Regions:
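Polytopic transmembrane helical bundles with strong interfacial aromatic enrichment
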Residues: 2-219
Length: 219
């Protein structure tokens, strides 16, 4: 039983899990790209540029989910002083920052043909940029503070403050007049996105989730 918790056995399991996820990732990636680039139709208004959505939207979802996880785990770590939680948040933060940047960049590329500009001080775009700064500050704190307790306290405060930004990003399209359209996918209501576009969107989301899992396990 004790061997199960031994570091060498844990790393052995992680290696096996990485190989397993890796094989699924490449198969699902091929399927997702086929649906996104071949089977999915162009939008009747946006044309082929709508295909950027299949990376942009999942990246935005993951960036929001990652920061939410960091905030919750940081609070738990601050209260209960669980070292593993600190390691988890430090591993998630660069992943979340990467996907936030992907969401912002792909959104800018998509915005040019759709809105006629790469950047606008739209409520959602601005709040996403603010979240990227929160990610960056969180990473820098753990990078340059030698004292774990001090780093945990400051990073927990940053994470909690940053958590306030999450509902602003989510509901900005409903609270203010923005360039972004209201949500097309709703958990509790009726989604307005057609299944021919929803399918590749969800497939790409699962592909990126697997990619996140691979990076996390490797770190």
């Amino acid at each position: 039983m004790l061997n199960f918790f031994h570091n060498s056995y844990i790393f052995f399991l992680i290696e096996k899990l990485i190989n397993f996820i890796n094989s699924i990732f490449f198969v699902l990636l091929l399927i997702a790209l086929s649906f996104a680039l071949v089977f999915s139709p162009p939008d009747y208004l946006q044309g082929e540029s709508v295909r950027i959505m299949y990376v942009h939207v999942p990246a935005a979802w993951i960036s929001l989910a990652s920061f939410s996880c960091i905030s919750i785990l940081s609070i738990l770590n601050f209260i209960f002083k669980i070292k593993n939680l600190k390691l988890i948040t430090k591993s998630i933060a660069p992943i979340g920052l990467m996907f936030t940047c992907i969401a912002i960049v792909t959104g800018s590329i998509w915005g040019q043909p759709t809105w006629g500009t790469f950047w606008a001080w739209d409520a959602r775009i601005t709040s996403m940029a603010i979240m990227a700064l929160f990610y960056l500050v969180f990473i820098v704190i753990h990078k340059f503070f030698d004292e774990d307790d001090k780093a945990n306290k400051i990073s927990s405060i940053v994470a909690v403050i940053g958590l306030i930004n999450i509902p602003i990003i989510k509901y900005s399209v409903e609270w203010w007049s923005t360039l972004h359209q209201p949500a097309s996918i709703k958990i509790t209501g009726t989604s307005t996105i057609h299944s021919s576009m929803l399918t590749p969107l969800l497939l790409m989301f699962f592909v990126l989730i697997l990619y996140c899992a691979l990076i996390f396990l490797m770190k």
